[in-house]
Amino acid sequence: MTPVDEYIERLENLHQQHLIFNLHRLLMSFQGVSTRLRFKIPFYDSKKWICYINPIKKNGVEVCFIKGFQLTNKPQLEARKRTMVKGISIYEINDETLSLIAEVFQEALELDKNS
């Protein structure tokens, strides 16, 4: 079991555990992606850091993209007073949410490969 798998398993909030588990599975399905715990949360990278999943209040998580300001302007990407990072807050997992995250992650991967 990897440190990220252990992190997910140890989460006390079962709803956040469910969200992160499904997002982790989705992100790890992309070729050339690896994961590692940094700052006590899961980070996903290829050549460089691409994104991380951060538990937030109200039973949600935020998928934060390191180079969020360079991504196509999607209304779901929120800056929250950050200069580089943009994130998408998630409170429920469904096909629409997974499709959105996959689309943004694919764009972030392409940006990473071309940098």
Region annotations inferred by a language model:
Residues M1-S115:
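Charge-dense, helix-prone N-terminal extensions
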